Curated annotation (Swiss-Prot):
ATP binds at residues 29-32, 86-90, 413, 504. The gene is groEL. SUPFAM superfamilies: GroEL apical domain-like, GroEL equatorial domain-like, GroEL-intermediate domain like. It comes from Mycoplasma pneumoniae (strain ATCC 29342 / M129 / Subtype 1) (Mycoplasmoides pneumoniae). Keywords: ATP-binding, Chaperone, Cytoplasm, Isomerase, Nucleotide-binding. It is an enzyme of class 5 (isomerase). This is Chaperonin GroEL. It comes from the Bacteria. NCBIfam families: GroEL (TIGR02348), PRK00013.1 (NF000592), PRK12849.1 (NF009487), PRK12850.1 (NF009488), PRK12851.1 (NF009489). Its EC number is 5.6.1.7.
Length: 543
């Protein structure tokens, strides 16, 4: 296919136009007074949402260069969500601001390499400062506050705090559709491990890139599956009884993965091959615990020659399995309580005799996973649209809360970023560059610093604007307030953010800044954009 090439300022401006279109659609959702966006879908019902990553994924622009720009910022939003579980809107706002300021500087003659260095160095200074100001969370009340802020609902905040109290801060919490309009919480037997589908062609939910199996049979293999012949009787048995089949193994030969994926796509069998991504003792432990919790064995050559005598009746069972990009969650495993308890007793006995820290930590982790189970939030709604929107909010809140438990919290509402931006005013920051670069280069590096400093103001400005208040007046007042004092968009008053429960997970904010800086740095150093020229039906080319 023929390609079109666009150079220099023209390329950057077109890419920037796409970034701005996507960012303008996403940033209206930020804050408690943020608005919804309705997404029209070709093959399904419209979706009303204020979830930044969902909006970003749906946007396709007609202009090919603008669409590339939109996709670049969309990737940053998705990446932020993958790492921190939330923060996509903040990442989008920061990326838009940094890119606009950066492109303006480069178009006006600044050296993009120097500006890029300034942006990257300044962002790292801010990330380090956020770590210093981060506050660990310990109480259920603090956990509830984080979840409530993320979801925009005190009721959801309470629900997630209850879930963490039931299964522990590092426990497994998942969501499911309720069959009523009410949203409820329950605990069940379950286990989670690092493992993902061996092929993306096995995915059933393209939007979330995950696959869900209801009432599956489960084959757990402690050895690599090399040929389809090894498991053919089990595949045929699963087809006969109508159950989906989950196969978990350390690895699969390419032939096996291809055959399974093709047959799944054809509808011959509902099967998912999951590669266990643990290694060494951790892999052995994960497979053993999975087998016991689902009522089967981790089959290997030591157990009578692999799968030679294994039938469908020997396989494990569970109520539900969710396979995502990095983890697999097995809910309601059908292993007998007596067998699981004996296994727990064995692990506890080993723990008492172990002195090595690695072994102790692994045993404690296994005991916790097997004994605490899984908390399931069953999401209800008056309509399918309402249920989907609520489920997205709960999943965002779960991710934010886990991030807060992991790395702590900072003042919310964009105030932490505004407060730390002042460290970039320090005149001594230039000293580290003086010995290695010219005065002209230094000036352009400091342009990058100024781009980051000004961009850190954008999230709080947008939250104020979305609340219906004049951002210029309120923002000017905030600049003179003490650190931690911000704008409560609900009450439209200035408050101590942390004391008022308006908080953000440190990990989310750091990741959003890191990804935004990466987008801006890439775009300002772009000199050429290349895209396909579409062909019309007559064979001549058209843009």
């Amino acid at each position: 296919m023929a390609k079109e090439l666009v150079f220099g300022k023209n390329a950057r401006n077109k890419l920037l136009a796409g970034i701005n279109k996507l960012a303008d659609a996403v940033k209206v959702t930020v804050g408690p007074k943020g608005q919804n966006v309705i997404l029209g879908r070709k093959f399904s019902n419209p979706l009303i949402t204020n979830d930044g990553v969902t909006i970003a994924k749906e946007i396709e622009l007609t202009d090919p260069l603008e669409n590339i720009g939109a996709k670049v910022i969309s990737v940053a939003a998705v990446s932020t969500n993958d790492i921190a579980g939330d923060g996509t809107t903040t990442a989008t706002i920061l990326a838009q601001e940094m890119t606009n300021r950066g492109v303006e500087a480069v178009n006006n003659g600044a050296n993009p390499v120097n500006v890029r260095r300034g942006i990257e160095d300044a962002s790292q200074l801010i990330i380090t400062e956020l770590d210093k100001r981060s506050k660990k969370i310990n109480t259920n009340e603090e956990i509830e506050q984080v979840a409530a802020i993320s979801s925009g609902s005190k009721e959801i905040g309470k629900l997630i705090a209850q879930a963490m109290a039931l299964v522990g801060k590092n426990g497994v919490i998942t969501t499911d559709d309720a069959k009523t309009i009410n949203t409820t919480l329950e605990t069940t037997e379950g286990i989670e491990f690092k493992g993902t589908y061996a092929s993306p062609y096995m995915v059933s939910d393209q939007e979330k890139m995950e696959v869900v199996l209801d009432q599956p049979k489960i084959l757990v293999s402690a050895m690599k599956i090399n040929t389809i012949k090894e498991i053919l009787p089990l595949l045929e048995g699963s087809m006969e009884n109508g159950n989906p089949l989950l196969i978990v193994a350390p690895d699969f030969a390419e032939e096996v993965v291809t055959t399974l994926a093709v047959n799944k796509l054809r509808g011959t069998i509902n099967v998912v091959a999951v590669k266990c991504n643990e290694y060494g003792e951790r892999q052995k432990a994960a497979l053993e615990d999975l087998a016991i919790s689902t009522g089967t064995l981790a089959y290997n050559n030591e157990l009578g020659g692999g799968f030679k005598d294994v039938t469908v009746n020997h396989l494990g069972e569970a109520r539900r399995v969710q396979v995502a990009k990095e983890k697999t969650t097995v809910i309601g495993g059908k292993g007998s309580k007596e067998t699981i308890q004996k296994h727990l007793d064995l692990l506890n006995g080993r723990l008492k005799q172990t002195t090595e820290k690695y072994d102790t930590d692994l045993l404690k982790e296994r005991i916790a996973h097997l004994s605490q189970g899984v908390a399931v939030v069953r999401v209800g709604g008056a309509t399918e649209l309402a249920q989907k929107e609520l489920k997205l909010r709960i999943e965002d809140a779960l991710n934010s809360t886990k991030a807060a438990v992991e790395e702590g919290i900072i003042s919310g509402g964009g105030i932490a970023l505004l407060n730390v931006s002042t460290i970039l005013n320090d005149s001594k920051l230039a000293d580290k560059y003086k010995a290695e670069t010219s005065a002209e280069n230094l000036k352009e590096i400091l342009v990058g610093y100024e781009i980051v400093r000004k961009s850190l103001e954008a999230p709080v400005r947008q939250i104020i604007e979305n609340s219906g208040v004049n951002p210029v007046k309120v923002f000017a007042e905030l600049r003179s307030e003490a650190d931690g004092v911000g704008f409560d968009a609900e009450t439209k008053k200035k408050v101590d953010m942390i004391r008022s429960g308006i908080i953000d997970p440190t990990k989310v904010t750091k990741t959003a800044l890191e990804k935004a800086a990466s987008v801006a740095s890439s775009l300002i150093t772009t000199s050429v954009a290349v895209y396909d020229i579409k062909e019309n039906k007559e064979g001549s080319f058209q843009e």
